[in-house]
């Protein structure tokens, strides 16, 4: 039973592989019905699937493919001319065959497929085609010359002989198609279970050996047959032909033993697991590089550093090579997706009553398997729209003096670490004026928005939910769904989509997608204690500017960069993170570009470029807007990965004048009197707080009080102004002083804030723990009022004698 299951799995793999090219071959055959090589290739697919399904007792699939084979066989002999109507029946049968294969894969049987009536109807149509054309073929045969008749009869005899071998094997013709036909009939009823199982295993092994021999024989016969034709056409070079043939024969004799060793099928789940392990290895490499940098800084000049550097460099290089090798195993040609579109365009052409030609280029371009699986649906929507909305009806194209056959071109090529897929048509193009009017009519935009909108921005209106230019809803399109989903799906792949169009000339849509989604290069930036990774493919440049270079236009901050004016927005405003704006210091701006859009994003600091492994945020957080995932940095800290497309959309709704914020920050920093200085006292003892209050009153400063560390932390985070110093007890309920100090130091904006421990703990261990948690001063209870005021004045930089 295990052997039979293995044969079934091999059959399904082979069948699905053959079907990938089948639709495209059939559409090509419809345009070139005289192409005998193409017809033979299609016939062999039906013949192979029929033979294998018959052996596996898949009777429904065998019945369907047998009738398909009959039609294709008649076409090979010239008895049937492939017309669009006949091709409709064949294509429908192919669809049903694919459905049966999926059912077999899922259930192990071709029964209960839910398509019984459709299959029976398709079989009747195939049989009708075969019988009708067989009669006409007989009539043509009687009128043909005697010589031709004899040759045709010989050919028919050969074909019938092959068919008879497949349909009803006998003892006389079992050598190739059915190696089991000469087996004696055994009385299985009187055999033990072990004997029956052994006999089945023997027969399976015999069948497998026969299949191997048959495949090897076909390989040896394939090339000599192809070389017969040129021999007749070029009789002047028989020696060259003979040498080539001899060489081919020699190579073919070696081929079977070599070919088997060259490839091996691997479960996709193993590749995914291997890719995950590589991701962890990359994280470990980044961590190792970071540790080496720390060691190098601490032990500068030591001899062991050179050897350590060699080891780290070697591990880094091997990890990179291994990563590229594993990624290459996951790469697949986009032709796996492209191959299904000729059939789709052919069906749409007949449905819409248009003549449309699909031109495919660059189908050998490779892309990560996970992306290949995801781009199919977006491309279907785009191509359907090109056929329905783009290509004009036949009469309209004639009036415009355009070729009657419209062209849709699908091409793919590499551009850096991205793949570019272009879909172009020579249809009517997009009218930006009409698009704006439709958008205003549907309430998508206002008239004021339309006035300042460029043509390219108008083209992007088709990506708005519910927007459609179709006047009539059809089975193909017009419901206003599809293109917004296309944009969403492409952005999920960290890709972009651009549209360029000209009225009367056509439309071009360009998709730009990264080659892989697992590991990317990113720019690491920081906003206070938060870290973010921006995909490097979207980063145009980074600049450091002063406050004087920031202007205000219509209430929003902008930056004049060379000859461009860019909108400015703080990353902290997008993700609602606290930030400090130093009015007297420069700011870092990351210029981000997506398609034709650019913005400047202000960050607190730049960390650098790093290779990051994208990890999912999990089920509950995966739909967090603006975040594509997370990664672990070389120093072990978690970093969020920015979804650039979503972030730019979020930035449009933010209206913050950065200059005003900086001025406000400057105003809060100016200290005109002692009361402008703020000190926060945190102690659970009301008596101790009263003592602090009495000691500091002569200074004239503002004193805030909290009863425990947790309350003090909330006051610090949510207060309008940042205290100039904090006096904190160690022993407190809810949150002690050590924990409070550790939490405060997590925020960059509090990194220089004086934290003064006021405690009765005086041991060296206590003091060391205080320093490690972030304390800057240590006052031991009991203390004098003079000492307390001296420490506070020094910490807050209060000048003069205020007592």
UniProtKB/Swiss-Prot annotation:
Keywords carried by this UniProt record: Kinase, Phosphoprotein, Transferase
Q: Name one Pfam family in it.
A: Response_reg
Q: Where is this region: Disordered?
A: 134-185, 209-255
What does the UniProt PTM comment say about this protein?
A: Autophosphorylated.
In this chain, composition skew of type Basic and acidic residues spans 136-166, 209-226, 233-254
Where 4-aspartylphosphate occurs, the residues are 729
Domain named Response regulatory: residues: 678-796
Q: Does the keyword Kinase apply?
A: yes
- Which Gene Ontology cellular component annotation is one that this UniProt entry carries? cytoplasm
Q: Per the record, what are the reactions this protein catalyses?
A: ATP + protein L-histidine = ADP + protein N-phospho-L-histidine
Sites bearing Phosphohistidine, chain numbering: 47, 273
**What job does the chain carry out?**
Member of the two-component regulatory system CheAY/CheY that regulates chemotaxis and colonization of the gastric mucosa. Functions as a sensor protein kinase which is autophosphorylated at a histidine residue and transfers its phosphate group to the conserved aspartic acid residue in the regulatory domain of CheY. In turn, phosphorylated CheY (CheY-P) interacts with the flagellar motor protein FliM to cause clockwise flagellar rotation and bacterial reversals, as opposed to straight swimming when CheY is not phosphorylated.
Query: PANTHER family of this UniProt entry?
Result: CHEMOTAXIS PROTEIN CHEA (PTHR43395:SF1), SENSOR HISTIDINE KINASE CHEA (PTHR43395)
What is written about domains in the entry's comments?
Answer: Contains a C-terminal CheY-like regulatory domain where the phosphate can be transferred.
Q: What is this protein called?
A: Sensor histidine kinase CheAY
Species annotation:
Helicobacter pylori (strain ATCC 700392 / 26695)
